[in-house]
Amino acid sequence: MTNSNFNHGNHGSNLPARLFTKQSQALIYNYKEAAVQRMLDFDNVSQRDTPSVGGLIHPGSDGGMYKAFFGFKELVIPVYNSVSEACQQCPNADVFLNFASHRSAYQSSLLALREPSIQTVVIIAEGVPENEARSLISIAKKLGKVIIGPATVGGIQAGCFKIGNTAGTIVYIMACKLYRSGSVGFVSKSGGLSNEMYNVLSRCTDGIYEGIAIGGDAFPGSTLTDHALRYEKLPEVQMIVILGELGGWDEYGIVEALKKGEITKPICAWVSGTVAKIFPTEVQFGHAGAKSGGETESADAKNKALREAGAVVPTSFEDFSNVIAATYAKLQSKGLVKPVEEPTPPELPLDFKTAVKAGKVRKPTSIISTICDDRGDELSYAGVPISEVCKEQYNMGDVIGLLWFKRKLPPYASKFFEMCLKLVADHGPCVSGAHNTIVAARAGKDLVSSLVSGLLTIGPRFGGAIDDSARVFQDAVDNNLQPSQFVEGMKSKGKRIPGIGHLIKSADEIDKRVVLLKDYAFTHFSSTKYLEYALEVEKYTLQKANNLILNVDGCIGVLFLDLLHSSGLFTQHEIKEIIDVGYLNGFFIVGRSVGLIGHALDQRRNKQGLYRHQADDVHYAL
């Protein structure tokens, strides 16, 4: 049957007989990591000397290098930010594998077609607009280039070159013996069915020489007929297997070629979609080109035409493997195919993640985490799903309880945490931390650098006395020291008492923050033993100087002791660990970070210039 509407793609066929060799290399656009590694794994079992991936293209990137494995060795693959740069730097790469979406596949494919070094363009995307597909086909024909796709999984030349994810995993490739060449040329519209057919052909014949999935869109860049005519020219191919589908006219091109004697090698063919005849109206079957339309486009009509033209066509798909096996057996009996010498493919090492999952290796971990888990579907804090944290409106005190103390704390405790954060958030621009942050911000440093500049001043003299005050006051109480004994003991050691004393606050000018903390504790804590002891110490130190008051660091430190001891949530061992590890200074660090960020932003917002200290405020003692 002849039809003027028959689409021959790059027809005549002007396609070169041989698309790939063991030296073929691909440039992969908008690359996918799994596809890159699968191609390289295929190279390894096929005993290629050079990797089939020449370069990767990540449009808009800064380039760089991508690491993958080539057998046991790690390979560094260059990453380029444009098609032209990649082609210039990789002149031996003649295949362009395009993983761009249907929205951008046209432009990137067009750029590749115009590069002299690129001979074959593979378009993976499904749903490329038909006018764009036709434009690419026309341009490719004028330039003498080959397009596979759109809407294709790609293709494979056994033991030679694999396109992207064709044939799936390395396990499947080994099972189908795709690591060495057979004598069957296979072409299909469907990528999924082509994978299944590789398995069938490995069992019924000596395997494929080459397999191509042209893609299921209405306008493929190259057709079933194009590739069948290619296989006719390849001396390694002894028989051709074709898997078509209803819709379109492509299969009639093969019918014409058979009738004209352009194809003389035996063809086994099947057109899927015979079930379409039970539907009264046109139905779409998956692919854009698979439509149950007119009678001549039906699977039954195509199968009949192919059979009448000389192709071996089964009565059903279930019988396809039998006719393939019978056809191959005839070739064997005529001596046209010789037994394949089975090579021993090199062993492919397991990826570490795969080996761990399979329980084949063990490895000591590098990090222990007991506070959160980001595996699975949802992040959790100390076992509490993040969705629950949001749904139940956990406050920052609750979150600190989970991530620092590994438990949900009672409301009075989490509110105390929040109160501490609020009270230490800022204490003006003149303190050392804020001053450093301001100087750094005015020097043009970024937000993180300005923040860190201020945080680095936190220590025993500024904001870092919470842990130390908790340690010394707990030791004094636990050893039953009288306040006077404690103070004089510290004095005799030549040490200041952490948490006692302030530069500007005094008994006459009290620190309102300390008042707020004391009031909260007396109202909500079941015991304030350590606070009461600290206040007795304060009475004694005030006899020595009016500014030797219990400051905010000291007050927070002793109140944490009261909270930890009276809550009933912590063991003595846990309390000791919390104080020894240094949890408590964390509250000052987190809280003060809010204020330091505020100062940095304030300076930048007000466009303050470089800070230089006044010379008259310096005593030059030379």
From Swiss-Prot:
Chain residues that bind Mg(2+): E245
Q: Which CDD domains match?
A: CCL_ACL-C (cd06100)
EC number(s) reported in the record: 2.3.3.8
Signal sequence, start to end: none
List, in alphabetical order, the GO biological process terms annotated in this UniProt record: acetyl-CoA biosynthetic process; fatty acid biosynthetic process
* Active site per the UniProt annotation: H287 (tele-phosphohistidine intermediate)
- Ligase listed as a keyword: no
* Membrane-spanning residues: none
What InterPro entries does the database record attribute to this sequence?
Answer: Cit_synth/succinyl-CoA_lig_AS, Citrate_synth-like_lrg_a-sub, Citrate_synth-like_sm_a-sub, Citrate_synthase, Citrate_synthase_sf, Citrt_syn/SCS-alpha_CS, NAD(P)-bd_dom_sf, Succ-CoA_synthase_bsu_CS
Under Pfam families, the record lists: Citrate_synt, Ligase_CoA
From the UniProt record, list the reaction(s) this protein catalyses: oxaloacetate + acetyl-CoA + ADP + phosphate = citrate + ATP + CoA
- What enzyme class is recorded for this protein? transferase
**Family named by the database record:** In the N-terminal section; belongs to the succinate/malate CoA ligase beta subunit family.
Primary role: Catalyzes the cleavage of citrate into oxaloacetate and acetyl-CoA, the latter serving as common substrate in multiple biochemical reactions in protein, carbohydrate and lipid metabolism.
Oligomeric state and interaction partners are given as: Homotetramer.
The name of this protein is Probable ATP-citrate synthase
Q: What is the lineage of its organism?
A: Eukaryota, Amoebozoa, Evosea, Eumycetozoa, Dictyostelia
Gene name for this UniProt entry: acly
